[in-house]
Amino acid sequence: MKVIIGLGNPGKKYEDTRHNAGFMAIDKISDKWGIPVTQNKFRALVGEGRIEGEKVLLVKPQTYMNLSGESVAEVLKFYKLIPDDLVVIYDDLDLPTGHLRLREKGSAGGHNGIKSMIQHLGTQEFKRIKVGISRPEPGRSVSDYVLNTFPVAERADIQEAVSLAADACAMWTRESFLKVMNHFNSLKK
């Protein structure tokens, strides 16, 4: 089984915010592959299904971003899986809005959700799909920025990125992550 985790904050008020790019990607996968993400387990909304024949578990932690690792660790423990069985999709301030970057491992890079995952999984070695949200203009607080919605001018870019993230996850069900990474990291915007 492959586990696809999207990071975000629960609740209507955070629904279309920059920090919820991971949740947006899970919603896209859910819609595209007909996998409802409605079960409340592991302090998360989860959905089990198949993508191209491979069993997958879609996960949207409901712990708020900074505690995401607690929920993810519960999922892995219950299913007796290891970090190599998962990919996490999340927002990245250091990428232009709408760009993707896939990595096999790495540091938290200042992202509190990833910091929590590293802490609770005990490793930095898990796959990532970063969705670019750009940095705020000088003088604007980062926390205010990530908790606001995308302006109209950026919505098409973010929807395209979320769609590509969903495609990357589907490809991962049948190919090595290295191959997926090489393909999607080479796409030009």
Curated annotation (Swiss-Prot):
Family annotation (CDD domains): PTH (cd00462)
UniProt keyword Electron transport, yes or no: no
PROSITE patterns: PEPT_TRNA_HYDROL_1 (PS01195), PEPT_TRNA_HYDROL_2 (PS01196)
Residue numbers marked as site, Discriminates between blocked and unblocked aminoacyl-tRNA: 9
Catalytic residues as annotated in Swiss-Prot or TrEMBL: 19 (proton acceptor)
A GO term from the CC aspect: cytoplasm
Domain of life per record: Bacteria
InterPro entries recorded: Pept_tRNA_hydro, Pept_tRNA_hydro_CS, Pept_tRNA_hydro_sf
Site positions (Stabilizes the basic form of H active site to accept a proton): 91
Localization: Cytoplasm
Entry EC no(s): 3.1.1.29
Gene Ontology terms for molecular function: peptidyl-tRNA hydrolase activity; tRNA binding
Description of how the protein assembles with itself and partners: Monomer.
Name of the protein in question: Peptidyl-tRNA hydrolase
Organism of this sequence: Brevibacillus brevis (strain 47 / JCM 6285 / NBRC 100599)
Organism phylogeny: Bacteria, Bacillati, Bacillota, Bacilli, Bacillales
Designated gene of the protein: pth
